Regions:
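ABC transporter nucleotide-binding domains
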Residues: 1-124
């Protein structure tokens, strides 16, 4: 078996909340992504699906290193890129792209999977 093109191990992306949580005197921490792992094989299509606010875009931005990971490892073609500096990342960023969801084609959590699949057939 060959090395994955992209491998993510126990990725964490936490953000400090600017204002304290209600009834708390300490600033909070928002766990946008917490211990996510997956791999993408070369030549394969990978879709990351989830509800709004579940961390999909944050994962993409962490892989491209637009958000600095709080923890975990990110590998591209076997090279660990999670801790690289900006200049070291440039050649990798030229090879990667994140395609963000179209809000008009996203899944609505208030509908069942059957409703979502059948809707286009009912319209046409």
């Amino acid at each position: 078996m060959s090395k994955p093109l992209i491998e993510v191990k126990d990725l964490k992306v936490y953000f400090k909340q600017k204002s304290p949580k209600l009834l708390s005197f300490k600033p909070g921490i928002l766990k946008a992504v917490d211990q996510v792992s997956f791999s993408i094989e070369k030549g394969k299509t990978f879709g990351l699906v989830g509800e709004s606010g579940s961390g999909k875009s944050t994962i993409g931005k962490a892989i491209l290193r637009y958000h600095k990971p709080t923890g975990g490892e990110i590998f591209y073609e076997g090279t660990e890129i999670g801790a690289m500096g900006e200049k070291e990342l440039l050649p990798y960023r030229k090879k990667m792209q994140s395609v963000f969801q179209d809000p008009y084609s996203s899944l609505d959590p208030s509908h069942t999977v059957q409703d979502i699949i059948c809707e286009p057939m009912e319209i046409h």
